[in-house]
């Protein structure tokens, strides 16, 4: 009987461990910190767990081979070509907006923003991406220690994650949802490419809904980091998703202007609002147009942080969009398209 009980006990422990490994946030919410400490006490050393929720797992490049090239050499050549064709560097990016669709659609556009990254100035990259696969209230950070790309692994900055966690405004990503989400991953090969051999860390942040004053809350938190010129913010967002499959297809049926140009005009109104660096202007634009900009909340966090940062110092801030395109030129109501734009925040000392 004692052998049977021991076997059952081990089975339960292994089950709990697998639950923990798959979803640390869920485990800690369900079983609580005391039980996690108990497991840490009785498990062999190879199964020890980090009680702050951060572990030694590596997030795979789950969209490589489908959304972008999985071959290191071919991907590197592709990124090099796009970056070489993106024109001259006109400044040093403090933050940027980049699309997150398959590279065949948006890689060229993304390159215009990443061309403005000066690797020697950057030690840490914050990546704010919208959640497409799970309903999330607020923001969540990763429990993984590395993010894999075909160009090499990117190291997660757990020191910053612990600081963010201490604010009590950040949840932990579920690992299965994290693997499925593409908005952060699609920025990583470009980051790896432009940073090259420079030593740096990343801080992936998944952004959900931001009701009430939460835009300002997160903006104030990230303003502290945006003030530091060693930090780069990458904001992941596509622009208009137009068509019946997106449940969004407004256009003026009486206008002679093609639908794709009407979409362009709507997007560029939003881009102009972002370039003012006024969160209220962008919020008003979204309420007026209901434009399906999936990264609206990461963009709003950036705008709130930039506003707080701008008020607290004597620097001049400039946001400039550099490239815009659409996946398809919509000419009839049965067509569909997604818009892509890239832009950069420059900070100039006075």
UniProtKB/Swiss-Prot annotation:
Transmembrane segments: none annotated. It comes from the Eukaryota. Disruption phenotype: 7-38% increase in lifespan compared to wild-type animals. Increased nuclear accumulation of the transcription factor skn-1. Increased resistance to oxidative stress as indicated by an increase in the expression of genes related to the oxidative stress response and activation of the p38 MAPK pathway. Increased reactive oxygen species production. Knockout with bli-3 RNAi rescues the enhanced longevity and increased reactive oxygen species production defects. Knockout with rho-1 RNAi suppresses reactive oxygen species induction and longevity in the memo-1 mutant. InterPro entries: MEMO1_fam. It holds the Pfam family Memo. Expressed in neuronal and non-neuronal cells in the head and tail, pharyngeal cells, spermatheca, distal tip cells, anchor cell and the intestine. Interacts with rho-1. Plays a role in the oxidative stress response and the maintenance of longevity by regulating the interaction between GTPase rho-1 and oxidase bli-3. In turn, this serves to modulate bli-3 activity and the control of reactive oxygen species production. May control cell migration by relaying extracellular chemotactic signals to the microtubule cytoskeleton. Belongs to the MEMO1 family. PANTHER family: PROTEIN MEMO1 (PTHR11060:SF0). This is Protein memo-1 homolog. It comes from Caenorhabditis elegans. The gene is memo-1.
